[in-house]
Amino acid sequence: DQKGKSPESECNKISEEPKCNEDKICSWHKEVKAGEKHCKFNSTKAKEKGVAVTQTQTAGGTEATTDKCKGKLEDTCKKESNCKWEGETCKDSSILVNKQLALSVVSAAFAALLF
């Protein structure tokens, strides 16, 4: 039962290459930085095996990018590269880029399944 546990942490618990590669959602990485685990979550492999896995996101990741534009004046907002003035507020335009990137990755994966 993997409820409440992130797929990454489940894969990180595996310490043997054969067991890691046998798992439907994990892949073994031979070369890793000091302190990193060899067995890591592999979303591509999980999708290919038909495993529905939602990767848990860290709470701080999206908040930090959203807040950097929040509360800025119009002139300052327009000068910032990742911000844009929308209506009466300064908004983070990089979120839109991230959503488009995610959509294109999903589209490419779907197209690969068709061929």
Swiss-Prot record:
Topology versus the membrane: Lipid-anchor; GPI-anchor
Subcellular location: Cell membrane
Keywords: Cell membrane, Glycoprotein, GPI-anchor, Lipoprotein, Membrane, Trypanosomiasis
Pfam families named in the record: Trypan_glycop_C
InterPro entries in UniProt: Variant_surf_glycoprt_trypan_C
Lineage top rank: taxon: Eukaryota
Lipidation (GPI-anchor amidated aspartate): 92
Chief localization: membrane
Residues with attached carbohydrate: 42
Propeptide segments, given as residue ranges: 93-115
GO cellular component, one term: side of membrane
Function of the protein: VSG forms a coat on the surface of the parasite. The trypanosome evades the immune response of the host by expressing a series of antigenically distinct VSGs from an estimated 1000 VSG genes.
Protein name: Variant surface glycoprotein ANTAT 1.8
Organism: Trypanosoma brucei brucei
